[in-house]
Amino acid sequence: MANLTRQSLQLPTEVSSEILQNTQEQSAVMQLARQVQLPGTGVSIPVILSDPEAAWVKEGDSKPVSSATVDTKKLVAYKLAVIEPFSMEFKRDIPALYDALVARLPLALANKFDATVFGKVDKPGEDFDTLKAVTGQDIKTDAYKGLVAADLDISEHDGIVNGYVISPRCKSILLTATDTTNRPLFINSVAEGAIPMILGAPTKQSKGAYVTGTPNTVGFVGDWTKAIYGTVEGVQVTISDQATITSGSETINLWQQNMFAVRAEIELGFRCDTTVFNRLTVTA
């Protein structure tokens, strides 16, 4: 919480743009889902529940009429913000300040957005979808069987798996999965140490994909063509040295302590067809 005065200064547009770009690069959800620009009041988006169906016809016969089944959802932007204090030395070295902002703020925004989509933290409102309650598939007993079960469930809901998001815990489980000859299933060699693809679909890694529960969730898989996130104006960044900020139980008077604070905020929304997503789970 902070009280920023009218002496706050807007940072250069290119810095805000770079923070947004880095946020998108560090968010697994933003890398996989489709982005749209939102008006401040939000927008209604169509959600296709079933596709039109073509049919063979004889010469001279009437052509069949088939329509897709479509529902609508309201895509609304909610504000996500973070304030970080810095020592005044950073303000005297503007390039160093910009480098620090570009390096630190995107990760904070990306982590919180991913954690919200995955149900690790509470969603900001009713018009924000999460994957918290989607169908779960156990991968601890038999990782390959669990992944195939997720693929099957998604296909049965007219989805096509095109992306995985795994937590570090999930990565460890998959790295230890072997076939009957004890060869690793999901990497070509132990020198790689990463899992770029699972069953032919790209893989992203995010700490937010680990959600404690019964059972614990360690990853997500789905048809990301049916997921969309919206932004209003990109990341807005302001700085102030005349504020009093509260961090937990600690109160910081910036002027008194020769510091300044940077506030970054972005308006984001997320919607998806939850039937074409699965959780990857393990029992504790």
Model-inferred region functions:
Residues 268-284:
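Structural signal for terminal/edge beta-strands and the immediately following C-terminal loop/tail
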Residues 53-57, 94, 173-176, 229, ...:
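Short helix/loop capping segments that flank catalytic or ligand/cofactor-binding pockets
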Residues 38-39, 135-260, 264-266, 278:
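Extended oligomerization regions of viral-like shell subunits
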Residues 2-80, 147, 276:
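Assembly/oligomerization interface modules of large self-assembling protein complexes
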